[in-house]
């Protein structure tokens, strides 16, 4: 993996040069000081500043990535790196690996929280292992995931509550991403090498995607995404819903489909948000890959033609590689389903 010159903070999404990274003292005896950068990120009320250990830059090391720095206050060495803009602690893979901010977008009650909760568990327990790697949670990520989505979905066997809007309640944790480091082994010239990827997942309320002003405030991460998963609720398509019995529809949806924002409206706002951020013209093509994904697929399985690839188990993990033939088959089948929705 080539040496990075810049990185994107997985918390505030500002882009910085690697040489601008800061460190935070970890010596408990070092005096706490007001941290205005972290305060602005957390709640914006500078009259009640968050307190923390001092932050500072490492001496210039040329092209090399600084590994540590000495605190100018207490003279102790620290390895804790933080973002220069928001002072949140950063995973080492942010500097050394590839940034992979994954945005999951969709209207209210499409199942975004469930999708993130399940895909994270699949990556941890199955996918990373089958591909000869491992996925580790950063800081308190694993604790928050296990106590939240994992506990309710896998232990209590219950559905998750609808995510609260970050605008209505800034303390609900929705703005704090789940950050993981995915490590994958590959063959090098003389020995095996390990590539690391910083995976960043968000659980965003559907109503936070309903207008452009809100999106530009609480969904800035979309513009920095390495990929966008566009979640589609089949219950919100009349042609699909009319083929299902009323009980199936009511069990799968807690929001009246007539009140849900149209999927094409959300995608149009996402596109405009990215174009404005990048100052792109309307005729320019956005280079962020988008995957259209049907949620609640079990509810519509009876409507899928027998023998379809999407009804079969994915072969990727069993083979320990990405199966291009399977991908092409699934892609064409989902495109076909979308064309009749």
Task: Label every PLM stretch briefly.
Residues 112:
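Conserved lysine of the Walker
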Residues 109:
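Walker A (P-loop) phosphate-binding loop of P-loop NTPases
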Residues 85, 91-95, 124-165:
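Flexible phosphate/Mg2+-sensing switch loops adjacent to catalytic phosphate-binding sites
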Residues 115-125:
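A conserved segment at the C-terminal end of the G1
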Residues 1-97:
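Long, basic/Gly/Ser/Thr-rich N-terminal segments
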Residues 60, 64, 175-228, 235-244:
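Switch II of P-loop NTPase G domains
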Residues 102-104:
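Hydrophobic anchor at the beta1->P-loop junction of P-loop NTPases
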Residues 193-196, 216-341:
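Conserved C-terminal guanine-recognition region of P-loop GTPase G domains, centered on the G4
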